[in-house]
Structures are given as structure tokens and as C-alpha cells.
């Protein structure tokens, strides 16, 4: 199989990709970072803020909170139409509201769960993200607008925390060397009856730390035309959706190039 599943968790996906050019696999990785849109706070209107944080700092914190974006991709207009929208912006924005205060003699930590949105499909991915600590008689009241955006605009619009392509490793043990078991940072090797063996080959990152101590007993190489693609989502989208949308973005760019060349 050219593509097979290595592992899958809630927000993480690892694929083994074979017989595809490295350039193509890396393009999908880059597109996952830069060209898959997600919802994020774009503008904040402060009504009241006497908290310890300036408006700009508080707005930045709000912008970096990931929001669920799966349904937004299907129902909101794309970034190309909304990034600089001044008129006829229907379908561009969702709104979020915050109105929290502390009474006399108390302190209140404001969390992402205190944000109220006008679209139930667009909510913070976690309600436990701290925003600001309010002291006695301090209050924050604001309204913010969210829109779809690309990671190339700002990292707040990037759906991934990790997007990595690495070579698929091949590890071969030619002789016994217990030191490799001790120094390998990835747990590639195991020991059984005093003998070294390869326990988890795919975990090898080709760092060659083991070879420093066991130069003639261990051989490490990268398998030709075989790679490991790892995607970890921040939670706005499932990793599978990120890869699908990354592929779509590449196809759109290729179609744009085709039209440009045909028009020459």
C-alpha cells in the first residue's frame, strides 16, 4: 500500500507514505500549516476593561484560543472573501461575547468557558484556557468577531501544532552493544537475555546517537521513497479533515496555475 496508517489518536495522525515524491508529501505538510482555514478571533470591541491587561494584550490572548471549525468550513465564506471585507459581509463572521466581573473582596479567573458565542457550532476547544485574573471590582466586557483565515496570515489561523515529514528508518543490529539500549532517546532498542534487538524501528529519528557508541554493530539508514507524515491538530479540526483540506488547497493552486499557463 502506498499509504498506510501508522497510528491515530484524538488529535494526532501518523501515516506511512511510500512511492510518492518527497516534494509532494512536503507540500501537503506545508499546506496543512498555511492553507487550511479555521475560525479565530479577528477583531475585538472593548466595552469595559479595567483588568490588569491592556486591551491589546487581552485581544491577543483571545485570538490565540482555538475554536471548533469543522462546521464553519461548510457554512462560512472563505478567507479570500472576508479577510478585508468592508461591505456585504454576511456569512463572514461569528460573534463571541464576554461579560465577567469580580465583586469587592474577591478575585475571579476568567476562562474560555466564559465566552458566549452566537453560533453553537463554534466554541473554544477547551473551557479551561485561562484568559485573565480579575481583582476586586475589576470587570471585562467585550464583543469579538471570528472569521475563517489561513495560517499564512497569522499563526492563530493554523490548525496544526505539529506537521512533520521524516524519512522512514531502517535499523539493523549486526552485533551486541548494550550501550545502544541505554543511550537511544526514542526507545528503539530492547534487551533480551543480554542480547540487543530492534524493538520499535519506526520510532528511530536517525539521530545516530547509538552509532557513536556502537559504530560497527548498528547500521541505520533511510528507506528510499518512504516517509512518515505526522499531523497534530490544535483541536479546531480533526487531523483527517486537515489532510483532506490540505489536498484540496493544492488542487486549487494547480488549477490556478493551469489557467494561468493556458492564458499565455
Curated annotation (Swiss-Prot):
Cofactors that this protein relies on: [3Fe-4S] cluster
UniProt-annotated location(s): Cytoplasm
GO biological process: DNA-templated transcription
GO CC, any one term: DNA-directed RNA polymerase complex
Annotated cofactor note: Binds 1 [3Fe-4S] cluster.
PROSITE patterns named among the record's database cross-references: 4FE4S_FER_1, RNA_POL_D_30KD
Keyword Metal-binding applies: yes
GO molecular function: 3 iron, 4 sulfur cluster binding; DNA binding; DNA-directed RNA polymerase activity; metal ion binding; protein dimerization activity
Residues engaged in binding [3Fe-4S] cluster: 204, 207, 210
InterPro entries the record matches: 4Fe4S_Fe_S_CS, DNA-dir_RNA_pol_30-40kDasu_CS, DNA-dir_RNA_pol_insert, DNA-dir_RNA_pol_RpoA/D/Rpb3, RBP11-like, RNAP_Rpo3/Rpb3/RPAC1, RNApol_insert_sf, Rpo3/RPB3_RNA_Pol_subunit
Keywords of this entry: 3Fe-4S, Cytoplasm, DNA-directed RNA polymerase, Iron, Iron-sulfur, Metal-binding, Nucleotidyltransferase, Transcription, Transferase
Catalysis performed (reactions): RNA(n) + a ribonucleoside 5'-triphosphate = RNA(n+1) + diphosphate
Keyword Chaperone applies: no
EC number(s) reported in the record: 2.7.7.6
Annotated SMART domains: RPOLD (SM00662)
Major localization class: cytoplasm
Entry-linked Pfam families: RNA_pol_A_bac, RNA_pol_L
PANTHER family noted in UniProt: DNA-DIRECTED RNA POLYMERASE, DNA-DIRECTED RNA POLYMERASE II SUBUNIT RPB3
Family: Belongs to the archaeal Rpo3/eukaryotic RPB3 RNA polymerase subunit family.
Oligomer status and interactors: Part of the RNA polymerase complex.
Function as written in the Swiss-Prot or TrEMBL entry: DNA-dependent RNA polymerase (RNAP) catalyzes the transcription of DNA into RNA using the four ribonucleoside triphosphates as substrates.
This protein's name: DNA-directed RNA polymerase subunit Rpo3
Naturally occurring in which organism (per UniProt): Sulfurisphaera tokodaii (strain DSM 16993 / JCM 10545 / NBRC 100140 / 7) (Sulfolobus tokodaii)
Top-level taxonomy: Archaea, Thermoproteota, Thermoprotei, Sulfolobales, Sulfolobaceae
Gene that this sequence comes from: rpo3
